[in-house]
Amino acid sequence: MSNKGIDKVAKIRKLNDLLRRYGIGGQILLTRSIRSKSKEEIAEIFEKVRTFNDFHRGNDPYSERDFGSFDYKGEKIVWKVDYYSPDMKYGSEDPSDLSKCARTLTIMLDSDW
């Protein structure tokens, strides 16, 4: 991978971390099954997503930190960052460029996937 490619991946990773950790730079979406949980449970799930750091080749093959999963009270929770065009109609042509990308972080049960 060229230095330019590495720089792009580093930018994508940073932008994904900003959204996941601080809610900056995109939308956070919860599926119905997550929204149906208590406020306390939702807060606990958000904290687990925010502090998630178990990234490895199996769940992060491109080093973008765009996916994670964990167990919560016997259920598997999954979160995923997706990249869209600014009008949200198509995929983003360049997820490293904020002017060309609208990010969403979706938090869901594995069974919602």
Language-model features: where?
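Short, compact, well-ordered microdomains
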Residues: D66-W113
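Compact soluble domain cores
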Residues: D7-F70
